[in-house]
Amino acid sequence: MIYKVFYQETKERSPRRETTRALYLDIDASSELEGRITARQLVEENRPEYNIEYIELLSDKLLDYEKETGAFEITEF
């Protein structure tokens, strides 16, 4: 399953929509909830300075759209 993690690069400032970034993780999980938990743990362990806003499971259609826009790249820690 592919998850899109929305985050701010620092926890020091208030979140702003304009500075929200995203990364993509390929998570092997048995449920959506387990995948979200694993994604959060991975980001928190490897990038503790990130302020995670939201974690979204990408549907096939949304994944295809993300690939078409050119912004899609799996992050590996």
Curated annotation (Swiss-Prot):
Q: Which domain of life is it from?
A: Bacteria
**Enzyme class label:** transferase
GO BP term, example: DNA-templated transcription
Q: Which UniProt keywords apply?
A: DNA-directed RNA polymerase, Nucleotidyltransferase, Transcription, Transferase
Task: Extract one GO molecular function annotation from the record.
Answer: DNA-directed RNA polymerase activity
A cellular-component GO term for this protein: DNA-directed RNA polymerase complex
Asked whether the keyword Plastid is assigned, the reply is no
Pfam families (alphabetical): RpoY (PF07288)
UniProt EC number: 2.7.7.6
Question: What InterPro entries is this protein classified in?
Answer: RpoY
For this protein, what reaction is catalysed? RNA(n) + a ribonucleoside 5'-triphosphate = RNA(n+1) + diphosphate
Q: How does it assemble?
A: RNAP is composed of a core of 2 alpha, a beta and a beta' subunit. The core is associated with a delta subunit, and at least one of epsilon or omega. When a sigma factor is associated with the core the holoenzyme is formed, which can initiate transcription.
Sum up the protein's function in the record's words: A non-essential component of RNA polymerase (RNAP).
Q: Family per UniProt?
A: Belongs to the RNA polymerase subunit epsilon family.
Protein name, per record: DNA-directed RNA polymerase subunit epsilon
Q: Which organism is it from?
A: Streptococcus pneumoniae (strain CGSP14)
Q: Which gene encodes it?
A: rpoY
